[in-house]
Amino acid sequence: MPVQGSQRRLLGSLNSTPTATPHLGLAANQTGARCLEMSIPDGLFLSLGLVSLVENVLVVTAIAKNRNLHSPMYCFICCLALSDLLVSGSNMLETAVTLLLEAGALAARAAVVQQLDNVIDVITCSSMLSSLCFLGAIAVDRYISIFYALRYHSIVTLPRARRAIAAIWVASVLCSTLFIAYYDHAAVLLCLVVFFLAMLVLMAVLYVHMLARACQHAQGIARLHKRQRLAHQGFGLKGAATLTILLGIFFLCWGPFFLHLTLIVLCPQHPTCSCIFKNFNLFLTLIICNAIIDPLIYAFRSQELRRTLKEVLLCSW
């Protein structure tokens, strides 16, 4: 967290462009070429972070309160919410402290600021990695529940889920510490990109296979009841649309950030790449947006969780 300028060293010094006055327009890069630069107002960034924070706190609270939600599936959803909560909270904290330093409202020695920056960077990076891991874990859990339905409760037990969760958190913290320490090495950035692509491929393969199985099942039912063919076609279209939305949101929110990392390795000095680097804060904002959307996709669709959430909100009043 540099004392001057609101650039983030988080995932490091990945972006060397300080945040300018919020605008959307053409800006000149170092070579004189003109490119589109979109700076995100700090107020908007903090507001989105706050929405994500509240949403995910509600999810974690509801799952913790209701013992019926202490199954492996909801444990993964709870950990996803906790990861998204940390992503939003750490970015909000970094932005807020940076604004206070710039305004002169907060005085701190450079060494203290550097230590705080390192801690926030590790929290942010580890929560991003764990968020991706738990998205993959949820996909695997759903895949097993469909293809191994009869053996699901013997395969995905609560102790195994807890061990998997512990392994994900430990691995995320260790890897993020190494990534932050060696952020200026191309191999580190490539590892992050490969990890993202692996999660994308894993989710795509599992969800496409699940959709194919569901369509196959619906087709079998339609053969027994010929009148239901139109319903089967509608089911296939609805399933395809749901899958497209799920994977599309994942790619749209996370893809630009990892494209940014890829271009740092491939073309750090190219004018076109320099234009993309200027939108680093936009890419972070998209990740915050993903943290807002995740509860809507994975948590709030559960009737039991929504009922518990209503009880929590009513009790708070």
UniProtKB/Swiss-Prot annotation:
It is a multi-pass membrane protein. One of its GO terms (molecular function) is melanocyte-stimulating hormone receptor activity. Its main location: membrane. Keywords: Cell membrane, G-protein coupled receptor, Glycoprotein, Lipoprotein, Membrane, Palmitate, Receptor, Transducer, Transmembrane, Transmembrane helix. The chain crosses the membrane at residues 38-63, 73-93, 119-140, 164-183, 192-211, 241-266, 280-300. A lipid is attached at C315 (S-palmitoyl cysteine). Receptor for MSH (alpha, beta and gamma) and ACTH. The activity of this receptor is mediated by G proteins which activate adenylate cyclase. Mediates melanogenesis, the production of eumelanin (black/brown) and phaeomelanin (red/yellow), via regulation of cAMP signaling in melanocytes. This is Melanocyte-stimulating hormone receptor. It comes from Macaca nemestrina (Pig-tailed macaque). The gene is MC1R.
